[in-house]
Regions:
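Glycine/serine-rich anion-binding loops at beta->alpha junctions
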Residues: 89-118, 136, 247-262
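ATP-binding N-lobe of GHMP and related small-molecule kinases
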Residues: 1-98, 116-125, 146, 150, ...
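A generic local secondary-structure boundary/capping motif
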Residues: 32-34, 128, 158-164
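Contiguous, small/hydrophobic- and glycine-enriched helical/loop subdomains that border
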Residues: 111-156
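Short, basic/glycine-rich phosphate-binding loops at helix/coil junctions
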Residues: 49-63, 110, 132, 211-220
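Hydrophobic C-terminal alpha-helix "anchor/cap" residues
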Residues: 34-37, 131, 241, 275
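Conserved, helical-rich catalytic subdomain that frames metal- and/or nucleotide-binding sites
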Residues: 54, 143, 147-248, 263-288
């Protein structure tokens, strides 16, 4: 049996994110395109002698006592009946509170790592049950590999249909460094005058639109307008990327990272070389 495992947790971008009307239970359904990108958190999961223990060490980032890693550990133990103790060391590279799914991806990575560590393969039903108790975006990150880099996502995030991922997407990301909780962001969307607007791309056409030239995309993000209204830093990021001649500019998730998509790697690299001097957190990335 292994005594430790290393796992990587990729970030994601929402290329499109429509927030639907609030449901009777107070939650919202979404319609979205999720895209994994090669920016990773790294986790070292080690066995410890004590049972029913999940110790989390995060040297570069302060985590609350209860977090997605501990939630994933508890969910794994509940599904499998295993109660072995572990220590998880998290090396954080995905910006926090950025809309890039870092916490959810970390949770999925813990489930995967624990499966390897204890030699137990979770069934699809067990994975679904565990993900539902950790977070809505966890479902997208449950599978890894080229076949699982892009998906059409709906419901609260639990309905994931993987699609062929494009390899010709060239991103520049700007991190404004502001944060609004997910609850606050949804409240802003609910109060925003465009909350009920019809999407430019019907849900059943999202995959087809994804395959078109980026300059022809009619995607949008329901969070972008209200969050940009609240935070001038987000407005600045959107403006800077638009002025850099990106073919498509959008915010991911409920913010606050903003990304631009460029027609070529050269165009993206040139924009990055200019923007990195005025933005402390600026990234040049491609689709995985």
């Amino acid at each position: 049996m292994l005594s430790s495992v290393h796992v990587k947790a990729p970030a994601k971008l929402n290329l499109h994110l429509k927030v639907c009307e609030k449901r009777d239970d107070g939650f919202h359904d979404i319609e979205s395109i999720f895209q994994k990108i090669p920016l990773y958190d790294e986790l070292l999961i080690e066995m410890v002698d004590s049972s029913c223990t999940c110790q989390v060490i995060s040297p570069d980032f302060t985590l609350p006592f209860e977090n997605t890693l501990t939630s994933a550990y508890k969910a794994f133990c509940s599904c499998t009946g295993i109660n072995g103790g572990v220590r998880i060391t998290l090396k954080k590279r995905i910006p926090s509170g950025a809309g890039m799914g870092g916490g959810s991806s970390d949770g999925a990575a813990v489930l995967s790592g624990l499966s390897k560590l204890f030699g137990v393969e979770l069934t699809p039903e067990q994975k679904h049950k565990a993900a539902s108790s950790v977070g809505s975006d966890v479902f997208f990150f449950l599978e890894d590999g080229d076949r699982y880099d892009a998906a059409v996502v709906s419901g609260r995030g639990e309905n994931v249909r993987y699609i062929n991922s494009r390899k010709d997407l060239y991103f520049v990301l700007l991190c404004p460094g502001v944060h609004s909780s997910t609850g606050e962001a949804y409240a802003l969307v609910d109060s925003w005058h465009n909350v009920n607007r019809a999407g430019n791309t019907p849900f059943n056409e999202l995959e087809d639109m994804y395959g078109k030239p980026v300059s022809e995309w009619t995607f949008y993000n329901s969070f972008t307008e209200p969050l940009a209204w609240k935070f001038p830093e987000i407005r600045k990021a959107l403006s800077d990327l638009q002025q850099s001649d990106a073919d498509y500019v959008q915010m991911t998730g409920s913010g606050s990272v903003v990304f631009g998509l460029f027609a070529s790697a050269e165009d993206a690299r040139n924009a990055y070389d200019v923007l990195k001097d005025s933005w402390a957190e600026c990234y040049y990335l491609t689709s995985r």
